[in-house]
Amino acid sequence: LKDAQSRITK
């Protein structure tokens, strides 16, 4: 679930 959160913080 880091991929989804990563794109959100990006």
From Swiss-Prot:
Coiled-coil stretches: none
Keywords: Periplasm, Sugar transport, Transport
Gene Ontology CC: one annotated term: periplasmic space
Protein localization: Periplasm
Top-level lineage group: Bacteria
Family (UniProt): Belongs to the bacterial solute-binding protein 1 family.
Biological role stated in the UniProt entry: Involved in the high-affinity maltose membrane transport system. Initial receptor for the active transport of and chemotaxis toward maltooligosaccharides.
Protein name (Swiss-Prot/TrEMBL): Maltose-binding periplasmic protein
Species this protein is from: Klebsiella pneumoniae
